[in-house]
Amino acid sequence: MEVQAEQEFEGIVEEYGDFVYNLTYRVLGNHADAEEAAQDAFLSAYRNFQRFRGESKVSTWLYRIAVNAALMKLRKDKNKRTLTHSGYDDLQLVSPAEGPERLALNSELREHLQQGLDMLTDNLKTAVVLRDVQGLNNEEAAEVLKISVSSLKARLHRGRVLLRQHLQEYLNQHRQET
């Protein structure tokens, strides 16, 4: 790779490093796997940087590569995966002022949310993570996944229904216990 292209790529890594890590973390659910997938994504992007033609935004191109890296890691490790971290530390479900009981419930709810995501197929999970966790709009998420917007909407609907059912079962059980 020529010097100018290397400098340009270094700028991309600097600008999008956290972004790629956060995406892989949301898909994989733990720091070590997310770091490995993010490194794999940037290695793949580096190898293919000269073929990037600028037909899409750099962020979209990196999303696709990062999603692929995370999904490859997920498939490779599927049999030995365990839930080591919820991946939703920044999700504030209750106020810390609510007390230790509410904080424990918050942590438990996060765990069940991650379990619900983990039970989804890769296609459904990725659609939900891109749209509902990463905050992409429908067009951006569809472009990253290389599917139509209507296909994305169908995946989102199925994924959300399954997540809702999973969380509803937990909430019903929790209500019976209290």
Which residue stretches match the model-derived regions?
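Helix-turn-helix DNA-binding module
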Residues: 118-126, 130-151, 165
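Sigma70-family region 2
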Residues: 2-3, 42-57, 76-77
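A short, charge-rich alpha-helical start-of-domain segment used by transcription regulators
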Residues: 2-22, 46
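DNA-recognition helix of helix-turn-helix
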Residues: 67, 71, 145-168
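Short amphipathic alpha-helical boundary/capping segments
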Residues: 9-11, 112-120
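Internal acidic/polar
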Residues: 80-103, 137
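Arg/Lys-rich amphipathic alpha helix in sigma70-family domain 2
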Residues: 64-85, 106, 169
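Structural recognition of an alpha-helix C-terminal capping motif at a helix-to-coil junction
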Residues: 22, 36-43, 56-68
